[in-house]
Amino acid sequence: MKFVRTEDLKAGMRLAKPIYNKKGVLLYERNSALTAPGIASAKNFGLIGVYILEPAEPLPPLSREDLEFEQLQTVYIFRLREVLNCITERRKLEKYPVFLEDILSHYGSLKHRVNFNQNLRSSDDFMYKHAISTAILVTMMGAHLRLPKEKLRILTTAALLYDNGYRLSLIHI
């Protein structure tokens, strides 16, 4: 499996990981062969690149939980980007409470480990995925420590927002 930038994709290449849209809807299943329209779609979707299987490489196993994590992470990246843009533009954070409750409900009662081994595609990906992974970890730890719900919300919010200065410094440099 190797990462291939969107501009270097060719028809016939097989996807190693699924591609989801910002709502978590599956666009392309893993092991799907790319087509010219699929490549154009990936470019329009704003993907920096995708993971491709080598021609003779078998499809590596992925657990249902890993696939769900990949899907949720894609949704969370778009939601976090929207939240941080609202903050930057001084707009009301109407969707933030739903986003926060989604993280708390998915990871606040989880009794098993989460595989945070993920693939970063850009500095943008790094910031968003790092903030989301930190928020998930904080949520899991806080729940394990039986922190009150309000403290858990505060900690998870801090984990999601603490890197916003890093994002803004990249924009203005």
Give the positions of each predicted feature:
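Terminal helices and disordered tails flanking the catalytic cores of nucleotide-processing hydrolases
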Residues: 1-100
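Acidic/His-rich, divalent-metal-binding segments that scaffold phosphate/diphosphate chemistry
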Residues: 55-170
